[in-house]
Amino acid sequence: MRPFLDDAKRRVDRRLSASKQSISTSRLLPSVLPDRFKDNHDAQVDFTAPPGGVGSREGHMQYMQQSIFSMIAAVGSRSDFHARFDESSDSDGETEGRSQTESPVKKVLGSSNPVNSQTEQRSGSQTSRKSEKDQSSRGRHHRRTISDHKFLRPFKTSSKPEPDTEPSTGDERLRVTLPRRPRSTTPRAAPILSRMVEAQAQFDSKTPSAGRSQNSSQESSIHSSHESSTSPLSTRLMEMFDFNKPEKVLVEYACSLLQSMLLQGYMYVTEGHICFYAYLPRKSTVAIKSGYLHKRGRKNPKYNRYWFSLKGDVLSYYADPSNLYFPSGHVDLRYGISASLAESKEKGREPKEFQVSTDQRTYHFRADSSVSAKEWVKALQKVIFRTHNEGDSVKVSFPIENIIDIEESPMMDFADTFKIRVVEDDDSYAIDEYFFSFFDSGREALTLLKSLVNENASGHSSRTLSPHADRSPRSDRTRRSRNRWSLTSGTSQPGNGSADTHRKRSASTSHLSLGPDAIPTSPVTRHQDPSESILNSFEQGTESSAVWQSMEDGAESASQILHRSDVFQSPTIHNLDKRACSDERSGRRQAGGTARSTLTHVNANKDGSPGEYSKLGNDGKPDREIRHVIHELDQETQGPSKPGPGAPTLNELVKAGTYPLQRAAGFAEYLRTRSKQMSNLLASESMGYIEKVSGMWVGGRRHYGEAEDVLPDDQAVDPEDKEDGCNYGDRFRAHFALPSTEKLQATYFAYLHRVLPLYGKIYISQKKLCFRSLIPGTRTKMILPLKDVENVEKEKGFRFGYQGLVIIIRGHEELFFEFRTSDARDDCAVTLHQHLESVKYLAESGLLAEQEKDESEAAMAEHRMLQEARLDDYGENDIPPLNESSGLHPIFDDPRASIVNFKPAESLRITCLTIGSRGDVQPYIALCKGLLAEGHKPKIATHAEFEPWVRRHGIDFAPVDGDPAELMRICVENGMFTYSFLKEASQKFRGWIDDLLSSAWASCQDSDLLIESPSAMAGIHIAEALRIPYFRAFTMPWSRTRAYPHAFAVPEHKMGGAYNYITYVMFDNVFWKAIAGQVNRWRKNELGLKATTLDKMQPNKVPFLYNYSPSVVPPPLDYPDWIRITGYWFLNEGVDWTPPVDLSAFIQRAREDDKKIVYIGFGSIVVSDPSALTRTVIESVQKADVRCILSKGWSDRLGDPSSAKTEVPLPPEIFQIQAAPHDWLFAQVDAAVHHGGAGTTGASLRAGIPTIIKPFFGDQFFFGSRIEDLGVGICMKKLNVSVFSRALWEATHSERMIIRARDLGAKIRDEDGVATAIQAIYRDLEHAKTLAQQRSIASSTPFSPTPSAKNTAEQGDDDVEDSEEWTFVGDDNEMDMSRRMRDRAISDAEMLPDRLLTNSIHGAGR
């Protein structure tokens, strides 16, 4: 891939100074900053410190930030805090797969002549564009080569000068190298053949253009007695199936080719051929199916339960579905042979067991039901079929004259199926059988085909099956070009002849014919001897096959003209297994595609002259000699070949035996690496045991070039390891079942910290970060896509003398690595950052590699051009198109979509309950406006001071008691858990809670649905009493996860998943203990409900709506289905706002002076020295040379009316405002500086500008850490001139930060958070109703004040109603997963609560 061509050179250059570089992706290097921004004497001073006696964040509770919610948790009187962990509450959920959508492709149809221009581009321009890296790209990628017409040129391109005999232009090479193929024969159901190869017909340079591109899917029959033989459809079929001339299309049907699965496509009947075409687009990064299965061990008959995910060509399984980066193992379906249900052990019962066979072993699985087992088998069969298919489309073609007979073969009640038997060719006498199923017009098709066969038989009565019979010129050409390849489930074997002739063949009883693109051929396979069956007994891993394994692949095409039906049943490629790889070209494939045998290509032109070779043998003979050999071989092929199965191994051993004495060690290494037992013991690494172990423990690092060899300036490599043929990249890809397009870039030895330090090896490739444990007895593997990595940070190690590296991942807990030396750690960090920058902006099309994207485009173009030709025929001949309803109807099986309309039929009365500041109310106004538009009747219940604002938007209002300003004053002025805080809060707070609960109960009457911020505390109990569905909504993380810490417990440094999870457990328990007494008394006296506990409430089962962007806080992998991150709920009040004239003039003047503009506003905060903070802001703005719009709100006491006044005069660079809508203001500035509240952060990020956050309390620390992790801003721990001026300069000059912020802003603006939230409400409404009913049945009493309480209780089961300890429990699997996560979190962090309360986490951990 082009972006990585110079990675090796850049990496070497940068690695030399790695230890001196800054590692933050969002910050500029110190060397880039001007000298004036170096730290001064005030670098450690914080001018935002609160007044004396209150203390700073460091002086008080370091983690429980100053907020109303923390205050609530702190002042519950007579609460037994020592017992806060005696009661537990479960959190569970399952992982939802994320898919990437495939972007539409149109560029391949851009030329005026789609046929010729595309042909020339693929053969000429793309050939020159490919790097030499493609020469070594073998294995899996060529299997995916699809209809991009690469058959017009050799797939292997080179930047080296061409030999004199090679045509200099792409057109000449096209004409000389590629003689035409007339037609193709097809399959028969034989046992195992190695793999399916593509053969796509070449395009003639004189072929007329097809014109426009059309997308149509039509599935019935077309009859045309007037159709011209040169119609667009005839021409297109001639090009695709390589006929001699355009053949008149007699009829067209929508049908399915029946093999292990129904392959839906089209049958075209021409004058001389029957053709079948199917388009099979693939998306390799989409999870096809996932779920729980039981897997049997290799030796242990016991079944163990795992979470399985089928993605691309790999079936992976995981012990924990929330840890999808750490697979327990995988089954590589590229080596798959079959997937089938096991035989039922009981008569009359369908089996739940099934098995998957590969070329190495058979895997046994058990599903939870027989239906599930069938679904898995069907999905696996599709994947195995795709891996056998050489691209994104399948073609089958055979001459009508070769048809023996056609007979009906009833298989399905709803379709007509018949079998066509075809003689493969005139030499082999092989007979193939094809089954075609017609869902419409089947009887008509059968009659027509039988009549054609009968007419052909009567017209050619002299035709025989004898290979010695007279044949027409076309027949002769067909004979010479048909069986150019024989493929086997084993490997290629040399033919019978001297080594000088370079004759290689692959042994098989089955033939797959390549199209004209598949240039390498094996001429000695024209005739097959019965002794060839001996060759089939060679296993892939044996010496005879491994020695002569050749991985030169031929030119590829996008689709296949298949020969013989057994191609559907053999493995695509064969395991690298315990043998030395030849080099990168070996991949894990056998001759010809794995199985492509490589040597010389014998192509016969029409006049019988030998064609030009496409690929050299291993020795690479010159043109002239190869031509001579080809000519000789072409002469030999007129008679039967004489394969010698014993010769290959003997010749190889003789050759090895003639090595000089100094090469004896190499021969011994050759034998040693082929020992299966030793290879298993040494983890398939082909190096000596002593060297392996010593190198492993010494550690270090290695970088690899384009050919995946160690760069010369890296650490010395063992000479024997160099001479050993096995490529480093091959072993890397074999370890993790990765495609051949994944190139190894660097490796490091390090410790992965999870529960215990685990020593292993880090692999960095173009798109993956992988880890493999090296400790005996451990099998930990990690595969992490770099696109999921947000940032990389250097930290101190957990152990003395070690250096730490933290990987921050989207929606997942952080990963910690430890290195022995700082050099290795710094080098790894720099390498990762280089790859992150490359990967971050690569277009994600849903495909694994750029080659696959090109190939998919070409296959799609071929499909569209064929559809276009059909439409052209319709226009010319007035033939009705295929009936849309005649063929197979697609089955709706997309788990991410739904055909069900979840919107309630009637209008709902929806109440939104919240408390707090203006920022807590604003999102609900936006949501209620959306609900009004949907026809519902929303109401907001909050503090009375917000009533005018709410009613101005046409939303109903209900008051809730409590003064938010007084609560905020207690939090801000007293700090957290100080003596003055506890004293004042205990005096005022308890009465406030009683008033809040009672007023909330009154405000929520007459509601059908309740949506509440969990800070309001009353909603879940009110919904239980009213028997109505209940949702939660909030602006910060409140649900348990290992990905992020609780918003009120953000640590100074990353602490990992165990810490993150335990913060939620702690806060839930402490918060509930503080209010439990008052809440239960209120439930009994006013709601008529029984007392409850945290476990009985099951708050983690409640549907939750988070109103921030999934691009800012990606959904964690361990969130259950009912927790949804919807996007911001913006109100957009600035649309009609008119700015003051002086503000507009200030902005205009700054633009004219070419100065950057920043906004600075921290809200209403309390600081010890307001004038010092003002001077700091002024000096920082002047030092950074920017213009500032200032919104001042700080003072030495909360609510001070003079807080907006400046203590010192403001310079002309600063313009002060009182208020302005954020959505308007942030669009006018280049950067924003604020306190980091959820709403303000969302507004600045939506504007697409870098954001600087100075957090003070609450969730502000969480959002500060998020913008820094995303690389779109800076979070300042202290505020002084040195730090602030540098941050202002970076935010306005760092192109990396500016681009990232701009891209993030575009993503946020594309979201519609309100609409997504409303759809989520509809979707989860039934789930919420179920929860409400279950809770009300369990907790209602005869004194319940709600009219429906008794009736509902009577409907419930008496046992459940009377149960005091009833607890709603969901799916067992869910609960098991929750329990495992909780147990792991608690065991991982036994002492963490004490550390949390003693301010010593960082010191104890590092």
From Swiss-Prot:
Residue ranges of every copy of the PH domain listed in the record: 286-385
Keyword Cytoplasm: yes
Acidic residues: bias regions: 1355-1375
Region of interest: Disordered: 83-231, 457-558, 576-622, 1334-1406
Entry GO terms, CC: phagophore assembly site membrane
Presence of the UniProt keyword Transferase in the record: yes
Cellular localization per UniProt: Cytoplasm; Preautophagosomal structure membrane
Transmembrane segments: none
Enzyme Commission identifier(s): 2.4.1.-, 2.4.1.173
Record's compositionally biased regions (Polar residues): 110-128, 490-499, 531-548, 1397-1406
GO BP of this protein: autophagy; carbohydrate metabolic process; lipid glycosylation; protein transport; sterol biosynthetic process
Domain of life: Eukaryota
Record's compositionally biased regions (Basic and acidic residues): 468-478, 576-587, 1376-1387
Signal sequence coordinates: none
Annotated ranges, domain GRAM: 236-286, 730-796
EC class of the enzyme, as a word: transferase
Binding site for UDP-alpha-D-glucose: S917, R918, D920, A1220, H1222, H1235, G1239, T1240, D1259, Q1260
GO molecular function: sterol 3-beta-glucosyltransferase activity
Pfam families to which the protein is assigned, alphabetical: EryCIII-like_C, Glyco_transf_28, GRAM, PH
Entry-linked InterPro entries: ATG26_PH_GRAM1 (IPR048066), ATG26_PH_GRAM2 (IPR048065), EryCIII-like_C (IPR010610), Glycosyltransferase_28 (IPR050426), GlycoTrans_28_N (IPR004276), GRAM (IPR004182), PH-like_dom_sf (IPR011993), PH_domain (IPR001849)
Membrane-related topology note: Peripheral membrane protein
Keywords, comma-separated and alphabetical: Autophagy, Cytoplasm, Glycosyltransferase, Lipid biosynthesis, Lipid metabolism, Membrane, Protein transport, Repeat, Steroid biosynthesis, Steroid metabolism, Sterol biosynthesis, Sterol metabolism, Transferase, Transport
Family to which the UniProt record says this protein belongs: Belongs to the glycosyltransferase 28 family.
Domain notes: The GRAM and PH domains are required for the localization of ATG26 to the preautophagosomal structure (PAS) and are involved in autophagy.
PANTHER family, per database record: STEROL 3-BETA-GLUCOSYLTRANSFERASE
Name listed for the protein in its UniProt record: Sterol 3-beta-glucosyltransferase
